[in-house]
Amino acid sequence: MKIIIDTDPGQDDAITALLAIASPEIELLGVTTVAGNVPVSMTTRNALQMLDLAGRPDIPVYAGSNKPLLRAPITATHVHGASGFEGAVLPPPSRKENEGHAVDFIIDTLRNNEPGTITICTIGPLTNIALALNKAPEVIQRAKQIVMMAGAFSEVGNITPAAEFNIYVDPHAAQMVLSSGIPIVMMPLDITHQLHTSAKRIARMEALPNRVGPVVAAWLRMEKAYEAKKYGTDGGPLHDPNTVMWLLRPDIYSGRKVNVQIETQSELTMGMSVVDWWQVGLLPANVTFLRTVDDDEFYEVLIERLGRLP
């Protein structure tokens, strides 16, 4: 299956790309970057480094939006560190990003492939996708689906009491995408908070006989220490790799189709995912919203796939 990853790397963003590259079922056509965890100059540099780590400097990287549609930029350096890749030291990128804008790459790639053949995995704010919708709405409709790490229901928020980070950074973009009519699969905090990066699981990654395993372990030890302390768990949640894992193993997830809207008016609940799980509203379902995951099987697949890399 052909995919584009739209991302703001971030340690767990990089693990998402590594999982995709390690999986023969997936053809990663390109990586597009957006401001989120850190500014776009850093997310682009990190994307280049993660592809070098995987031994795939041939995969194109296009820099995208450096700010949300309407709001001031918000970062998560308190989680990911100043560079977004704290925890492991990687060599400088072997190349520069590709010429051109991420939005144009997304549009051109969808235009040049058969309709319904490309999945967009979004693991950062949805600014690039919203801009593509605004620029070429008829082209973006050619996407097979968008699989996004975004939102929350029972877990509510991780950046404010009401909002998940990727949505909160650019809630207006998120609402545009959710209103687009494109098939959407949402991996919310309800899923990711079941996937504890325990010391035992990290140790298994560190023991992989390649260069990727120890780097991933170092990333997770750094990034997830903050969240483990915050939530009082045996390891912080693992967020972004769920997008690619769902493509590989949808059988380990469960959920249902519901309506999801994003709050864009109230400062108190800005960016809240309003999930009609109990179908009490009148709006039609626009999202496949997932709520449970087999955490042990998730990590078995992830660790095995990471072990295939250099």
UniProtKB/Swiss-Prot annotation:
Organism listed in the record: Schizosaccharomyces pombe (strain 972 / ATCC 24843)
Protein name, UniProt field: Uncharacterized protein C1683.06c
Pfam families referenced in this protein's UniProt entry, alphabetically: IU_nuc_hydro
Any Gene Ontology CC annotation: nucleus
Family: Belongs to the IUNH family.
Biological classification of the source: Eukaryota, Fungi, Dikarya, Ascomycota, Taphrinomycotina
Location(s), subcellular: Cytoplasm; Nucleus
BP terms from Gene Ontology: nicotinate nucleotide salvage; purine nucleoside catabolic process; pyrimidine nucleoside catabolic process; pyrimidine-containing compound salvage
Keyword Ligase annotated: no
Active-site residue list: H239
Record keywords, A-Z: Cytoplasm, Glycosidase, Hydrolase, Nucleus
GO MF: nicotinamide riboside hydrolase activity; nicotinic acid riboside hydrolase activity; purine nucleosidase activity; uridine nucleosidase activity
